[in-house]
Amino acid sequence: MSYETTQVSAELVNKAFIDKLDSGMEKEAMQAGSQFIRMKLYEEGLIRRLFDWRTITPDELVPNTDNDKPQTIVDKEAEATKATFVGFKGTGDRAYFEGRRFPIYFGKIESERLSKSKFELMSIRHDIMQWLKDNQVKMVQQEEDEAFIETVKDIITTNSSDQEKTVAYSDPEDYKEGFVEGLKGLTSLRLPVGKVAMHQNTYYESLNLTKDLVGHKGMDDRWERGVDGENSLWGYPVVTTIKDDIIPEDEMYFFAPQDYFCKCYLLQDATLFLKNEADMVHFHTYEAPGMGIGNTKGIFRVKLT
């Protein structure tokens, strides 16, 4: 049975999930839950949508001479002066590397460990997978995005004169000017533009753009459709978030393409762990990500003030 279908009632989906637990099929229940959680992370997480992630194999790990923490060693981008890694829990303090190669450390992200009676699970009237999303996916997603954006902000702070621009914003033309400044910012660093990240409300501001800024066809399309479902501005891919603690309104982050900027690995992708004891179900989600930024110049921020 598919846990993603909208054609089956929540009661039937929940019953199928609980029946697996009652039948000793914890592994199957974990697989179904893990698949759903991973899907939602890639659909809604900021860094999961910005970059492609690859599961790394144990033979790609490199022994750490100081401890047993997992790591891999990768080449820094050819034109880069510095490289670093995203400080997930367990990776240690952030450091910058100037040599030809640098390490990517794998951390651990774990949701809160929850316990719930299967009788309580039976009483949930909405899809239990949606309940897992609210109680597991959001915790993991928040930790991923927070660790990444903290790294990005730290990089920009150390080199704000070259990687940040403030644009006075009072009319739609200023919005376009800010966007163009972001494009030019990466170009001045001798890098192409990959994707742009911003708050959803900042993206909605693009509805104020006039026909002389976006063209007649662009205006007609937006009048008919609005911006929901869009994922670009002037042909550049845009990724949005509604979390102002991750990206505040009126800020735009321009990233170089992944090949010029970062490497994203998973020692283990998000996995739902379930343990059934009598009527109690214990569960939590964990993963082991590692993200290296091979070129700290691959980011440019524009602030609209």
Locations of regions flagged by a protein language model:
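Sequence/fold signature of self-assembling virion shell proteins
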Residues: 2-11, 18-19, 26-27, 209-305
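Short, Φ-rich (hydrophobic/aromatic) sequence segments
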Residues: 32-47, 182, 252-270
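Alpha-helical scaffold segments that mediate packing/assembly in large oligomeric complexes
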Residues: 111-188, 304-305
